[in-house]
Amino acid sequence: MTISLSDAGKRYNRDWIFRHFNYSFHSGTSYAITGPNGSGKSTLLQAIGGALGLSEGKLEYGLATDTLYRHISIAAPYLEVIEEMTVTEFLHFHQAFKPLLPDLSIQEIIACTGLEAAAHKQIRYYSSGMKQRVKLAQAIFSDVPVILLDEPCTNLDAEGIALYQQLIDRYCKGRLVIVSSNDKAEYGFCKETVNILQYK
């Protein structure tokens, strides 16, 4: 799958977040969108995922946009999980909309993310780091060709960051991964880097 943006731009009122963005993202390659805090990395990532409309330019996926949600998963600090559910219930709920990787059960996915001991607790009782693990699980273990990760190590301790890096290495090969971050620990594996400051 290829995602292509041509002369793309996004603005709020008179302020351009990015402009004249020309880039193609290809399957099997990992990309980092970098830049300082407040530079528009998250806005660009949301535009790539189709969650935000462009103010100018063109965005193409090479497939019908009404099926796009089946091909893209995302984890981001501003996207919440359903806290009244347990992680087991949440992943079953998620699976109704988007299939999970075929060779793993939900119990195995929970084990891979280190949440076995809390599998039957409501997510509302999780720490912020545990909630971030749930977000990463629903994104990385979705059986989709494109994974978008916005500041994926938010609220993770050193052990959680190491786990994130292991999950990326083990389960994301061959897929199109785009990470929005200014932290090398989050995007050090990426093959290509896009600095959003070049598109102001």
Regions found by a protein language model. Name each.
Residues 54-70:
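Conserved ABC transporter NBD signature motif
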Residues 34-36:
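The feature captures the beta-strand-to-loop junction immediately N-terminal to the Walker
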Residues 3, 17-20:
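Conserved structural motif at the start of ABC-family nucleotide-binding domains
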Residues 49:
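Helix-to-loop junction immediately C-terminal to a conserved catalytic motif
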Residues 136:
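Hydrophobic anchor residue at the start of the ABC signature
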Residues 147-151:
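Catalytic Walker B motif of ABC-type/P-loop ATPase nucleotide-binding domains
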Residues 78, 83-99:
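Q-loop/switch helix immediately C-terminal to the Walker
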Residues 103-118:
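Conserved ABC ATPase "signature" region
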